[in-house]
Amino acid sequence: MSAAATMAPVSLRIHAIAYGADDVLLFDLRAPARDGLAPFDAGAHIDLRLPRGITRSYSLLNDPAERHRYVIGVKREPESRGGSAWLHADARVGALIEVDGPSNHFALDESAPHAVFIAGGIGITPLWSMVQRLEHLGTPWTLHYRARSRRGAALLDELAGHGDRVHLSFSDEGAPSLDLAAIVAAAPEGAHFYCCGPVPMLEAFEAACVGLDPARVHLEYFAAKEAPATEGGFVVHLARSGRTIPIAAGCTILDALQAGGVAVPSSCQQGVCGICETAVLAGVPDHRDLVLSDQERAAGRTMMICCSGSKTAELTLDL
Protein backbone atom coordinates (compact mmCIF):
# COMPACT_ATOMS: atom_id res chain seq x y z
CA MET A 1 0.00 0.00 0.00
CA SER A 2 1.26 3.49 -0.77
CA ALA A 3 2.26 5.74 2.09
CA ALA A 4 2.32 9.42 1.28
CA ALA A 5 4.08 11.77 3.62
CA THR A 6 1.67 13.94 5.58
CA MET A 7 4.08 15.88 7.80
CA ALA A 8 5.31 19.40 7.06
CA PRO A 9 8.84 19.61 5.63
CA VAL A 10 11.72 19.97 8.07
CA SER A 11 15.07 21.69 7.65
CA LEU A 12 17.95 19.28 8.09
CA ARG A 13 21.63 20.10 8.15
CA ILE A 14 24.19 18.20 6.11
CA HIS A 15 26.30 16.80 8.94
CA ALA A 16 28.72 14.84 6.76
CA ILE A 17 29.38 13.87 3.15
CA ALA A 18 31.35 10.68 2.55
CA TYR A 19 32.60 8.72 -0.44
CA GLY A 20 30.35 5.72 -1.09
CA ALA A 21 31.69 4.47 -4.41
CA ASP A 22 32.64 5.91 -7.78
CA ASP A 23 29.95 8.53 -8.51
CA VAL A 24 28.19 7.78 -5.19
CA LEU A 25 28.19 10.12 -2.19
CA LEU A 26 26.69 9.36 1.22
CA PHE A 27 24.89 12.25 2.94
CA ASP A 28 24.34 12.24 6.70
CA LEU A 29 21.41 14.58 7.48
CA ARG A 30 20.56 15.73 11.00
CA ALA A 31 18.27 18.20 12.75
CA PRO A 32 20.10 21.47 13.56
CA ALA A 33 18.86 21.50 17.16
CA ARG A 34 19.77 17.85 17.70
CA ASP A 35 16.11 16.98 17.96
CA GLY A 36 15.00 13.46 17.23
CA LEU A 37 13.82 12.84 13.68
CA ALA A 38 10.58 11.23 12.60
CA PRO A 39 10.95 7.44 12.79
CA PHE A 40 11.15 5.40 9.61
CA ASP A 41 10.78 1.78 8.58
CA ALA A 42 13.26 -0.13 6.43
CA GLY A 43 12.67 0.58 2.74
CA ALA A 44 11.54 4.17 3.33
CA HIS A 45 12.67 7.24 1.42
CA ILE A 46 12.76 10.98 1.97
CA ASP A 47 12.13 13.80 -0.50
CA LEU A 48 14.73 16.56 -0.73
CA ARG A 49 13.64 20.03 -1.84
CA LEU A 50 16.60 21.33 -3.79
CA PRO A 51 17.32 24.66 -5.54
CA ARG A 52 15.35 25.74 -8.63
CA GLY A 53 12.20 24.06 -7.38
CA ILE A 54 13.61 20.55 -7.75
CA THR A 55 12.38 17.74 -5.49
CA ARG A 56 14.11 14.37 -5.51
CA SER A 57 13.47 11.13 -3.60
CA TYR A 58 16.27 9.10 -2.02
CA SER A 59 16.10 5.83 -0.09
CA LEU A 60 17.21 5.82 3.54
CA LEU A 61 20.07 3.37 3.98
CA ASN A 62 20.79 3.61 7.68
CA ASP A 63 19.48 1.48 10.53
CA PRO A 64 15.81 2.28 11.26
CA ALA A 65 16.68 2.11 14.96
CA GLU A 66 18.62 5.36 14.57
CA ARG A 67 16.59 8.42 15.50
CA HIS A 68 19.24 11.13 15.19
CA ARG A 69 19.97 11.05 11.46
CA TYR A 70 18.91 10.10 7.95
CA VAL A 71 21.56 8.71 5.61
CA ILE A 72 21.09 8.59 1.83
CA GLY A 73 23.28 7.45 -1.03
CA VAL A 74 23.24 9.63 -4.15
CA LYS A 75 24.60 8.35 -7.44
CA ARG A 76 25.54 11.05 -9.92
CA GLU A 77 23.55 10.36 -13.07
CA PRO A 78 24.94 11.63 -16.40
CA GLU A 79 21.46 12.67 -17.50
CA SER A 80 20.68 14.40 -14.18
CA ARG A 81 18.21 17.28 -14.44
CA GLY A 82 19.65 18.92 -11.34
CA GLY A 83 19.10 16.55 -8.41
CA SER A 84 22.17 14.35 -8.19
CA ALA A 85 24.24 16.88 -10.16
CA TRP A 86 23.56 19.63 -7.60
CA LEU A 87 24.16 17.36 -4.61
CA HIS A 88 27.50 16.18 -6.02
CA ALA A 89 28.73 19.59 -7.17
CA ASP A 90 27.22 22.15 -4.82
CA ALA A 91 26.05 20.57 -1.56
CA ARG A 92 28.30 21.40 1.38
CA VAL A 93 28.60 20.23 4.99
CA GLY A 94 26.65 22.63 7.19
CA ALA A 95 24.09 23.56 4.56
CA LEU A 96 20.37 23.23 5.30
CA ILE A 97 18.02 21.22 3.09
CA GLU A 98 14.24 21.06 3.28
CA VAL A 99 13.10 17.44 3.62
CA ASP A 100 9.69 15.79 3.35
CA GLY A 101 8.93 12.34 4.69
CA PRO A 102 9.81 9.67 5.45
CA SER A 103 7.44 7.71 3.20
CA ASN A 104 7.49 4.03 2.34
CA HIS A 105 6.30 2.26 -0.81
CA PHE A 106 8.79 -0.62 -0.37
CA ALA A 107 8.10 -1.96 3.10
CA LEU A 108 9.84 -4.91 4.74
CA ASP A 109 7.57 -7.76 5.85
CA GLU A 110 8.99 -8.50 9.28
CA SER A 111 6.83 -11.60 9.73
CA ALA A 112 8.56 -13.56 6.93
CA PRO A 113 10.80 -16.47 8.02
CA HIS A 114 13.57 -15.54 5.55
CA ALA A 115 14.38 -12.66 3.20
CA VAL A 116 16.21 -12.82 -0.12
CA PHE A 117 17.54 -9.47 -1.33
CA ILE A 118 18.58 -8.77 -4.92
CA ALA A 119 20.29 -5.44 -5.57
CA GLY A 120 21.58 -3.78 -8.70
CA GLY A 121 23.90 -0.78 -8.43
CA ILE A 122 22.57 2.01 -6.24
CA GLY A 123 19.53 -0.20 -5.55
CA ILE A 124 21.51 -1.56 -2.60
CA THR A 125 20.54 1.44 -0.45
CA PRO A 126 17.03 0.48 0.76
CA LEU A 127 18.05 -3.17 1.01
CA TRP A 128 20.94 -2.36 3.33
CA SER A 129 18.48 -0.66 5.69
CA MET A 130 16.36 -3.83 5.59
CA VAL A 131 19.40 -5.99 6.36
CA GLN A 132 20.14 -3.94 9.46
CA ARG A 133 16.56 -4.26 10.64
CA LEU A 134 16.56 -8.04 10.18
CA GLU A 135 19.82 -8.27 12.11
CA HIS A 136 18.01 -6.74 15.10
CA LEU A 137 15.12 -9.17 14.67
CA GLY A 138 17.36 -12.20 14.23
CA THR A 139 15.67 -13.10 10.94
CA PRO A 140 17.87 -14.97 8.42
CA TRP A 141 18.56 -13.31 5.07
CA THR A 142 20.73 -13.55 1.97
CA LEU A 143 21.81 -10.81 -0.43
CA HIS A 144 22.78 -10.98 -4.10
CA TYR A 145 24.44 -7.75 -5.23
CA ARG A 146 25.25 -7.03 -8.88
CA ALA A 147 27.24 -3.99 -10.03
CA ARG A 148 29.39 -2.98 -12.97
CA SER A 149 32.55 -2.93 -10.83
CA ARG A 150 33.77 -3.07 -7.25
CA ARG A 151 34.73 0.61 -7.44
CA GLY A 152 31.17 1.45 -8.42
CA ALA A 153 29.50 -0.69 -5.74
CA ALA A 154 28.39 1.14 -2.61
CA LEU A 155 28.52 -0.21 0.96
CA LEU A 156 31.01 -3.02 0.29
CA ASP A 157 32.83 -2.35 3.56
CA GLU A 158 29.57 -2.60 5.50
CA LEU A 159 28.63 -5.83 3.75
CA ALA A 160 32.04 -7.45 4.23
CA GLY A 161 31.27 -8.58 7.78
CA HIS A 162 28.31 -10.74 6.78
CA GLY A 163 30.22 -13.63 5.25
CA ASP A 164 28.53 -16.07 2.91
CA ARG A 165 25.14 -14.41 3.28
CA VAL A 166 26.37 -11.80 0.78
CA HIS A 167 26.97 -12.83 -2.84
CA LEU A 168 28.75 -10.23 -4.98
CA SER A 169 28.78 -10.15 -8.78
CA PHE A 170 30.68 -7.65 -10.97
CA SER A 171 30.30 -7.47 -14.72
CA ASP A 172 33.81 -6.07 -15.33
CA GLU A 173 35.24 -9.20 -13.68
CA GLY A 174 33.43 -11.44 -16.14
CA ALA A 175 30.78 -12.67 -13.71
CA PRO A 176 27.63 -13.83 -15.51
CA SER A 177 24.35 -12.05 -14.89
CA LEU A 178 22.46 -13.18 -11.80
CA ASP A 179 20.39 -16.30 -12.42
CA LEU A 180 17.30 -14.96 -10.72
CA ALA A 181 15.18 -18.01 -11.45
CA ALA A 182 17.76 -20.21 -9.72
CA ILE A 183 17.99 -17.83 -6.77
CA VAL A 184 14.22 -17.89 -6.30
CA ALA A 185 14.04 -21.67 -6.68
CA ALA A 186 16.78 -22.25 -4.10
CA ALA A 187 15.28 -20.00 -1.43
CA PRO A 188 13.92 -21.47 1.81
CA GLU A 189 10.22 -22.21 1.98
CA GLY A 190 8.14 -19.14 2.72
CA ALA A 191 10.95 -16.71 1.92
CA HIS A 192 10.09 -13.19 0.80
CA PHE A 193 11.96 -11.65 -2.12
CA TYR A 194 13.05 -8.01 -2.49
CA CYS A 195 14.60 -6.43 -5.56
CA CYS A 196 15.79 -2.90 -6.28
CA GLY A 197 17.88 -1.96 -9.29
CA PRO A 198 17.73 -1.06 -12.98
CA VAL A 199 14.63 -1.80 -15.03
CA PRO A 200 16.03 -4.88 -16.87
CA MET A 201 16.89 -6.52 -13.54
CA LEU A 202 13.47 -5.75 -12.11
CA GLU A 203 11.70 -7.14 -15.16
CA ALA A 204 13.79 -10.32 -14.95
CA PHE A 205 13.00 -10.52 -11.23
CA GLU A 206 9.26 -10.25 -11.90
CA ALA A 207 9.54 -13.02 -14.49
CA ALA A 208 11.45 -15.23 -12.05
CA CYS A 209 8.75 -14.75 -9.41
CA VAL A 210 5.79 -15.66 -11.62
CA GLY A 211 3.69 -18.22 -9.77
CA LEU A 212 4.68 -17.05 -6.31
CA ASP A 213 2.20 -15.53 -3.91
CA PRO A 214 2.38 -11.79 -4.79
CA ALA A 215 2.54 -10.99 -1.08
CA ARG A 216 6.03 -12.55 -1.03
CA VAL A 217 7.36 -10.44 -3.92
CA HIS A 218 8.55 -6.88 -3.27
CA LEU A 219 10.30 -4.52 -5.67
CA GLU A 220 11.11 -0.87 -6.14
CA TYR A 221 11.71 0.86 -9.43
CA PHE A 222 13.97 3.91 -9.71
CA ALA A 223 12.90 4.53 -13.32
CA ALA A 224 9.70 4.25 -15.34
CA LYS A 225 8.62 0.90 -16.76
CA GLU A 226 6.19 2.28 -19.34
CA ALA A 227 5.57 5.56 -21.14
CA PRO A 228 3.42 8.21 -19.43
CA ALA A 229 -0.14 8.80 -20.55
CA THR A 230 0.03 11.72 -23.00
CA GLU A 231 -2.90 10.88 -25.26
CA GLY A 232 -4.95 13.74 -23.80
CA GLY A 233 -8.51 14.37 -24.95
CA PHE A 234 -10.11 14.76 -21.51
CA VAL A 235 -10.65 17.47 -18.90
CA VAL A 236 -9.66 17.61 -15.25
CA HIS A 237 -11.90 19.32 -12.72
CA LEU A 238 -10.15 20.68 -9.64
CA ALA A 239 -12.61 20.28 -6.78
CA ARG A 240 -11.06 22.75 -4.35
CA SER A 241 -10.41 25.62 -6.74
CA GLY A 242 -13.35 25.01 -9.05
CA ARG A 243 -11.14 25.21 -12.12
CA THR A 244 -11.35 22.97 -15.17
CA ILE A 245 -8.14 22.18 -17.06
CA PRO A 246 -8.22 20.59 -20.54
CA ILE A 247 -5.55 17.93 -21.10
CA ALA A 248 -4.25 18.19 -24.65
CA ALA A 249 -2.45 15.45 -26.55
CA GLY A 250 1.28 15.38 -25.90
CA CYS A 251 1.19 16.40 -22.24
CA THR A 252 0.50 14.79 -18.89
CA ILE A 253 -1.98 15.99 -16.30
CA LEU A 254 0.93 17.43 -14.32
CA ASP A 255 2.21 19.29 -17.40
CA ALA A 256 -1.20 20.85 -17.97
CA LEU A 257 -1.67 21.83 -14.33
CA GLN A 258 1.74 23.45 -14.10
CA ALA A 259 1.16 25.31 -17.37
CA GLY A 260 -2.09 26.59 -15.86
CA GLY A 261 -0.32 27.89 -12.78
CA VAL A 262 -1.45 25.11 -10.44
CA ALA A 263 1.31 24.27 -7.98
CA VAL A 264 1.54 20.52 -7.37
CA PRO A 265 4.48 18.80 -5.62
CA SER A 266 6.37 16.51 -8.00
CA SER A 267 9.78 14.98 -8.49
CA CYS A 268 10.55 12.00 -10.71
CA GLN A 269 8.04 12.73 -13.52
CA GLN A 270 7.93 8.96 -14.05
CA GLY A 271 5.52 7.60 -11.45
CA VAL A 272 8.08 5.96 -9.20
CA CYS A 273 8.47 8.32 -6.22
CA GLY A 274 4.86 8.96 -5.18
CA ILE A 275 5.25 12.68 -4.47
CA CYS A 276 2.51 13.76 -6.90
CA GLU A 277 -0.06 11.26 -5.58
CA THR A 278 -3.47 12.93 -5.77
CA ALA A 279 -6.91 11.83 -4.59
CA VAL A 280 -9.46 11.06 -7.32
CA LEU A 281 -13.04 12.12 -6.56
CA ALA A 282 -14.69 11.11 -9.86
CA GLY A 283 -13.69 9.44 -13.11
CA VAL A 284 -11.50 6.44 -13.89
CA PRO A 285 -7.71 6.91 -13.91
CA ASP A 286 -5.45 5.28 -16.50
CA HIS A 287 -2.68 4.19 -14.14
CA ARG A 288 0.91 4.18 -15.42
CA ASP A 289 2.79 4.43 -12.11
CA LEU A 290 4.92 1.94 -10.21
CA VAL A 291 3.81 3.01 -6.72
CA LEU A 292 0.22 1.85 -6.27
CA SER A 293 -0.68 -1.76 -5.60
CA ASP A 294 -3.06 -3.64 -7.89
CA GLN A 295 -5.77 -3.22 -5.27
CA GLU A 296 -5.21 0.53 -5.06
CA ARG A 297 -5.29 0.84 -8.83
CA ALA A 298 -8.56 -1.07 -9.00
CA ALA A 299 -10.09 1.15 -6.31
CA GLY A 300 -9.24 4.24 -8.35
CA ARG A 301 -9.21 6.56 -5.34
CA THR A 302 -5.75 7.98 -5.96
CA MET A 303 -3.31 8.42 -8.86
CA MET A 304 0.12 9.75 -9.84
CA ILE A 305 -0.65 12.73 -12.05
CA CYS A 306 2.88 12.96 -13.48
CA CYS A 307 2.36 9.87 -15.62
CA SER A 308 -1.22 8.57 -15.37
CA GLY A 309 -4.14 9.71 -17.49
CA SER A 310 -7.89 9.13 -17.66
CA LYS A 311 -10.08 6.42 -19.12
CA THR A 312 -13.07 8.75 -18.90
CA ALA A 313 -13.78 12.08 -20.59
CA GLU A 314 -13.74 13.85 -17.22
CA LEU A 315 -11.66 13.39 -14.10
CA THR A 316 -12.19 15.20 -10.81
CA LEU A 317 -9.20 15.61 -8.51
CA ASP A 318 -8.93 16.80 -4.91
CA LEU A 319 -6.97 19.92 -5.83
UniProtKB/Swiss-Prot annotation:
One of its GO terms (biological process) is catabolic process. [2Fe-2S] cluster binds at residues 268, 273, 276, 306. Induction: By 3- or 4-carboxydiphenyl ether and by phenol. PROSITE patterns: 2FE2S_FER_1, 2FE2S_FER_2, FAD_FR. SUPFAM superfamilies: 2Fe-2S ferredoxin-like (SSF54292), Ferredoxin reductase-like, C-terminal NADP-linked domain (SSF52343), Riboflavin synthase domain-like (SSF63380). The keyword Oxidoreductase applies. Its cofactor is FMN. It comes from the Bacteria. Residues 7-109 form the FAD-binding FR-type domain. Pathway: Aromatic compound metabolism; carboxydiphenyl ether degradation. Keywords: 2Fe-2S, Aromatic hydrocarbons catabolism, Electron transport, Flavoprotein, FMN, Iron, Iron-sulfur, Metal-binding, NAD, Oxidoreductase, Plasmid, Transport. Belongs to the PDR/VanB family. This is Phenoxybenzoate dioxygenase subunit beta. It comes from Ectopseudomonas oleovorans.
